[in-house]
C-alpha cells in the first residue's frame, strides 16, 4: 500500500493517534472476533446496526428513535381502543449521565448463519421495551416471553428502584439524598444495607454479616483498594496511573 497523503517536512513521525477513534471490532486472546458494522447515512448514521462474529454469523441490530417509539405507542393505543399515554416525541438532549440522542436498541435478529443458512429464526433473538422517558423497561426472549422488568423513580429519570427476573421475587432499592443506594431489599433472599463514609463503605446483609470496602481517590478515580470480608479475610488491590 501507500500513504494517503505525504507528510510535511516538519511533522513528527509517527503521527500521534487521535484521542477518539471509531471502534470497528473486538478480538479476544483466543482469536474470537466481533466485527461492527455502522450505518453510513440517515438518522442512524455512525451507529452500530450490524455485528458479525467469528463463526460468520451476522446479527442485525434494530434501532429506534424516541419519535418512532412514541408513534408506535400511539398506534398500539388506537388499535387497542385505549387512551394514548403521555409519550413525548423527544427526550432532553442532555442529562446528568451525558448526551442523549434518544436512539435505543429495540431488537436483535440473526440474519445469516453459515452453518444453517436456510434455518434462520422468524423472530428476533431478543427484544427490548422502553419507557416514555427512554429507560429500559422490559426484555423479551425469542419466544416473546418477558424475562426482565425494571421500575424507575418517578422524580429522578434513570434511577432504578426495582427489577425482576420472570419467576423470581422483585428486588427493590432505596437511595439517600445524594443518589446512593442505601438498601437492597429481597423478600425471598438476602437483603443488604449500605453505609457510606468518606473512604469506606460498610455492607451488611440480613444475616448481620458485614463487609467493608476501603476506597482511595476522588470522583471518577475512586477505587476500592481493600476489602474486609465477613469471614475476617482481607483482599487488597493496587492500581497503576493509567
Q: What would you call each of these model-derived segments?
A:
Residues 1-242:
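Extended charged/polar low-complexity repeat regions
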Amino acid at each position: 500500500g501507500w500513504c494517503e497523503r505525504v507528510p510535511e517536512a516538519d511533522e513528527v513521525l509517527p503521527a500521534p493517534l487521535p484521542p477518539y477513534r471509531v471502534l470497528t471490532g473486538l478480538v479476544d486472546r483466543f482469536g474470537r472476533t466481533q466485527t461492527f458494522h455502522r450505518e453510513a447515512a440517515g438518522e442512524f448514521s455512525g451507529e452500530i446496526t450490524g455485528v458479525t462474529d467469528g463463526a460468520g454469523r451476522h446479527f442485525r441490530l434494530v434501532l429506534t428513535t424516541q419519535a418512532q417509539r412514541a408513534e408506535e405507542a400511539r398506534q398500539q393505543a388506537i388499535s387497542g381502543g385505549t387512551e394514548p399515554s403521555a409519550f413525548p416525541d423527544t427526550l432532553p438532549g442532555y442529562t446528568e449521565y451525558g448526551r442523549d440522542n434518544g436512539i435505543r436498541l429495540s431488537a436483535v435478529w440473526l440474519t445469516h448463519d453459515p452453518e444453517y443458512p436456510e434455518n434462520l429464526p422468524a423472530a428476533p433473538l431478543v427484544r427490548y421495551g422502553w419507557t416514555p422517558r427512554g429507560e429500559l423497561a422490559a426484555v423479551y426472549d425469542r419466544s416473546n416471553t418477558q424475562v426482565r422488568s425494571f421500575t424507575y423513580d418517578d422524580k429522578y429519570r434513570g434511577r432504578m428502584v426495582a427489577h425482576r427476573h420472570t419467576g423470581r421475587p422483585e428486588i427493590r432499592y432505596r437511595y439517600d439524598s445524594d443518589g446512593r443506594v442505601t438498601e437492597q431489599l429481597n423478600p425471598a433472599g438476602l437483603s443488604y444495607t449500605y453505609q457510606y463514609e468518606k473512604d469506606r463503605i460498610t455492607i451488611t446483609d440480613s444475616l448481620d454479616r458485614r463487609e467493608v470496602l476501603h476506597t482511595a481517590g476522588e470522583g471518577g478515580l475512586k477505587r476500592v483498594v481493600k476489602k474486609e470480608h465477613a469471614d475476617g479475610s482481607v483482599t487488597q488491590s493496587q492500581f497503576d496511573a493509567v
